[in-house]
Amino acid sequence: MRKVYVIPTYHCNLKCPHCELHLKEDNFSEKFFKILDDIKSPDITLFGGEPTLYRERLKRCLETEKISSISTNLLILDAELISLYKYYGISIATSWNPKRFTEEQYKLWVENLRKLEENGLKCIILITLTEDLLSYENFNLLLKEWDNIESIEGILFEPLLDYQMSRDLHERADLWICSLYDEWNFRIRNLIADKVMKWDCNCSDVWTLNPNGQLSRGCPQFEKKFVLNECLGCNLAGICRPCHLQHICSFPKNLYKKVLENANLASSSISARA
């Protein structure tokens, strides 16, 4: 198993508009831990829902010493959790989107990012490319604020998965990311600029362990699989292994061209100096 998402609960303390996982029935079973004990994978992520909601489930997962990372909204963070993350060497990912937090929740989230910093822990921020993000004013001001929080190592922008979305959303998101890429002048890494050079969304060996103990093939969002006709003859097939859950091409082609051009320019500059 190349990658496994382990979901101790679907319950969540947020109701993000682009996420429907919290609507699923939890139906937790002790079978969950029996299956987790048998799983062998180099990359196991605690996912949800919000995996920190039920402390004993979380601790039992970590005690297997198989968990490598956690995806958390970071609204729950205390001395015990910090100690657990440090002891088990857990990589942390958290998320932000314009409609994710109330004002008070956002303040708490930033406080907890600073707690990570104070305790020598690092994280990345995941941001879904939603309509409201593309129209969000003064996003650069947020980036400047986050750039001063040493716990934040990088930001990864991710394509929205929504079968009701506008058909040109991914194209507009690509152009939005390109504009941001041109202006990027921060300590924080823009991780999609790295990912776009090897866009591997292949989920053939990705699995999800659900709270009821069912182990299913695919990521937590898996519903149905699409094979797009445009992918079959695409000249970027060697670079892009697409997400088969997307019903519209989500590969940021314009960003890929920009990053490739910059890499070629940098290579030419090094060769000229040699």
Go through the PLM ranges and name each one.
Residues 15, 48, 210-212:
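Residue-level recognition of short loop/turn positions
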Residues 1-31, 242-249:
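Canonical Radical SAM [4Fe-4S] cluster-binding loop centered on the CxxxCxxC motif
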Residues 18, 22-25, 146, 175-177, ...:
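Secreted/processed peptides and extracellular or luminal domains of membrane proteins
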